[in-house]
């Protein structure tokens, strides 16, 4: 199989539904990246994971922010149709220094506006997870979800 082009497909999955071995693999990798563990043995011991499980999953699991570095992230927001809500969303994106590529907003119906925003995260000062969390905390943002990235 050497020489064959292997395209990998990725999914965005809530970590709540992942098996424990995959979660612990991600934790062990994070310990190694942050320098909190010096060796793989130390990392897997700290998270109570077998080395074989670590090696099985290490190339297929990584945090959302790592998968989305230098990417375009598209998310859908459900906003209350109140003055200033969209402005607060855009100001939050600007604070994170994400580059807004597109904004699509439907006509508000029954006090709710659906907005789709695509951002380029190459110059961001923080990880995309924290941007999404900050957007979700804005008064008037009822729902936010990632609908794509490339």
UniProtKB/Swiss-Prot annotation:
SUPFAM superfamilies: ACT-like. InterPro entries: ACT-like_dom_sf, ACT_dom, UPF0735_ACT_dom-cont. It comes from the Bacteria. CDD domains: ACT_PheB-BS. Residues 74-149 form the ACT domain. Belongs to the UPF0735 family. NCBIfam families: PRK04435.1. This is UPF0735 ACT domain-containing protein DSY2247. It comes from Desulfitobacterium hafniense (strain Y51). The lineage of its organism: Bacteria, Bacillati, Bacillota, Clostridia, Eubacteriales.
């Amino acid at each position: 199989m050497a020489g064959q082009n292997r395209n990998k497909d990725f999914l965005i999955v809530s970590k709540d539904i992942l098996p424990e071995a995959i979660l612990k693999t991600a934790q062990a990798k994070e310990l190694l990246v942050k320098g909190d563990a010096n060796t793989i043995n130390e990392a897997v011991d700290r998270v109570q994971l077998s080395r074989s499980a670590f090696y099985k999953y290490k190339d297929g699991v990584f945090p959302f922010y790592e998968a989305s570095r230098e990417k375009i992230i598209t998310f859908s927001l459900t906003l209350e149709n109140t003055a200033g809500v969209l402005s607060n969303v855009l100001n939050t994106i600007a604070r994170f220094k994400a580059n807004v590529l597109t904004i699509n907003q439907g006509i508000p119906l029954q006090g709710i506006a659906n907005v789709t925003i695509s951002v380029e995260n190459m110059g961001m000062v923080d990880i995309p997870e924290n941007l999404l969390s900050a957007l979700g905390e804005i008064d008037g943002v009822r729902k936010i979800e990632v609908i794509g990235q490339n």
